[in-house]
Amino acid sequence: MLCQNSTCTMDTNEDAGRFVVTGTDAHLVRVDDYALVRVTGKDAVTFLHGQFTNAIQGLGDTVRSAGYCTPKGRLLATMRLWMDGDAVMMLVPKAIGPAFIKRLRMYVLRADVKFECATDGVVMLGVTGNAEAVLADLHMPVPAEGAVVRHEGLTILDAEVAQTIAGFTTGGRRALIVAPADHALVADAGDGAYWWASEVAAGKVTIWPRTRELFVPQAVNFELTGGVVFNKGCYPGQEVVSRVQHIGETSRRASIGLVAGDAPLPGAPIFSDGAEVGFVVEAVQKDGKSLILFSSLRAALLGKLTLTPEGAEVDVLPLPYKITSTK
């Protein structure tokens, strides 16, 4: 599918969200799994504000995560958003981009809103950890928490802090860089699978084709990583998401795990004592081990978790943030 007024296409790989590290350790990597979408028109901000789980009005010089839900409160897409002049920029996985944009367009009606694929001519780079030192070595500014900075033709986005997981990521502050495709940084960038390992290590959910409509935001800790605000007014699924929040507890939460063997696909089941208790959100494989983000019944974390009823045990790791009551 083509974005409006553009010649670029998006990948529709249904198995996206499972990654295998093939390159050497790298702190600056090329991330080709994202599509960049520019949204313009006098009604663009108002329209998007009424569609997503986070506030789009008042973005200013910040970058925010947001989700797009079904009327039943299930996540269809996740994204990062920031302003570029009067345009709203959306960073979404290529694999969900076509269905996501198609669905958004259904609700534009008479509003002045246009979607344009802005991926041509740019490359997304990820700083997978220790961003202060990495960016300083590159003579680039470090964005403040949640901020966007621009430097010599680059757009640098702050990203959530990740924890250290030996062999996968060094942890610490992270960043995303929108760079011209011919920029010198691009040639030296490493394996993009390390970016997705850092996303798992940050406890940061991305919705992939196999996990569309599986999770309410709280089941993947989305409100704990800045993806939901509860005072912005209506959006699709808002009543369900708010109801879960005001109950005070949710029976499902996201966790990080390490397990021997090949990386599972997103949406693959998680088992406890032979019973299905959750689903894989994302997975990265390296050297015979897989780092996974998964959502499961909270009570199941007290027992043995596996990827198959008789499979290897998942070693549950700490999250880089606290699980709090939803109330």
Label every model-predicted segment.
Residues 49-57, 98, 102-110, 140-141, ...:
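Short, intrinsically disordered, mixed-charge
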Residues 238-239:
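Structural motif
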Residues 191-192, 197-223:
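Short, conserved active-site entrance elements at the starts or edges of catalytic domains
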Residues 61-64, 141-157, 263-268, 304:
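Glycine-centered loop/turn motifs
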Residues 38-44, 127-130, 258-265:
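Short, surface-exposed ligand-recognition loops at beta-strand->loop->(often short) alpha-helix junctions
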Residues 25-30, 35-36, 80-202:
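Acidic, low-complexity central loop/insert segments
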Residues 220-227, 242-327:
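Glycine-rich, small/acidic residue-mixed loop/short-helix segments
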Residues 2-78, 83:
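Acidic, proline/glycine-enriched N-terminal capping motif
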